[in-house]
Amino acid sequence: MLTKRIIPCLDIKNGKVVKGINFVGLKEIGDPVELAKIYEEQCADEIVFLDITASFEEREIIGELIGRAARELSIPLTVGGGIRSINDFRRILASGADKVSINSAAIENPEFIHQAANEFGVQCVVVAIDAKANESGSSFEVYIKGGRENAGIDLVEWAKKCEKLGAGEILLTSMDKDGTKTGYDLKMLNAVCSAVNIPVVASGGCGSISDIIDVFEKTKSDAALVASLFHYGEATVDEVKEELIKNRIPARIIKKEII
């Protein structure tokens, strides 16, 4: 089993970290750069910044925030939200991000994935997918515009297409689970993980360390995105990793030298 990644996710609105339930009822948590620095000290593997209103309101992400974070962090930074064009993609990377996450624009123009992969390399291209179960619960549907609009696309078919077009990673968020703290959507994750060969990052629903253990033991997810658990101080990244290792799940831990 490859080393599993723990990735704190910072949903950003108007330059502040926020958190809600099922994509609504947002509460302000704090400054994204300061939180990211804390998580890096706790041995986070990567950081994700998602501007959760940029796509819907068609706003551009402020490069200054990305630049601040890039200067302060030594771990990879993924940034998403409002990425509409190759120029947007280029600007985010130039600001200091290591990867760029695209969502709505990829569905509206799938060739965007191919163009980005060709110009910047597949390692920079993350396709974020927001999905929820259909009415019968038999399959999953993709949503865009920050989860506000049904794209009318089957999740598994879209994930396969993303891989074919050049996505280096899929960031899969369960809208049904988002913010509920009832555990990841294992059924959804298994459906996608079994259909693609690129890394899948699990997102939406983490409420405890046991939920993270479950997602790695019961799915082939490569990484777990975590928000509320860390933002509200219910656990630290290093505490999560210690429990993973106790459960024979490989995780990266850097031992701090005592001076």
From Swiss-Prot:
The keyword Chloroplast does not apply. It is an enzyme of class 4 (lyase). Keywords: Amino-acid biosynthesis, Cytoplasm, Histidine biosynthesis, Lyase. The active site is at residues 11, 130. It catalyses: 5-[(5-phospho-1-deoxy-D-ribulos-1-ylimino)methylamino]-1-(5-phospho-beta-D-ribosyl)imidazole-4-carboxamide + L-glutamine = D-erythro-1-(imidazol-4-yl)glycerol 3-phosphate + 5-amino-1-(5-phospho-beta-D-ribosyl)imidazole-4-carboxamide + L-glutamate + H(+). GO terms for molecular function: imidazoleglycerol-phosphate synthase activity; lyase activity. GO terms for cellular component: cytoplasm. Pfam families: His_biosynth. It is found in: Cytoplasm. It comes from the Bacteria. Its main location: cytoplasm. Pathway: Amino-acid biosynthesis; L-histidine biosynthesis; L-histidine from 5-phospho-alpha-D-ribose 1-diphosphate: step 5/9. Disulfide bonds: none annotated. Its EC number is 4.3.2.10. The keyword Phosphoprotein does not apply. InterPro entries: Aldolase_TIM, His_biosynth, HisF, IGPS_HisA/HisF, RibuloseP-bd_barrel. One of its GO terms (biological process) is L-histidine biosynthetic process. Heterodimer of HisH and HisF. IGPS catalyzes the conversion of PRFAR and glutamine to IGP, AICAR and glutamate. The HisF subunit catalyzes the cyclization activity that produces IGP and AICAR from PRFAR using the ammonia provided by the HisH subunit. Belongs to the HisA/HisF family. NCBIfam families: hisF. HAMAP family: HisF. This is Imidazole glycerol phosphate synthase subunit HisF. It comes from Lactococcus lactis subsp. cremoris (strain MG1363).
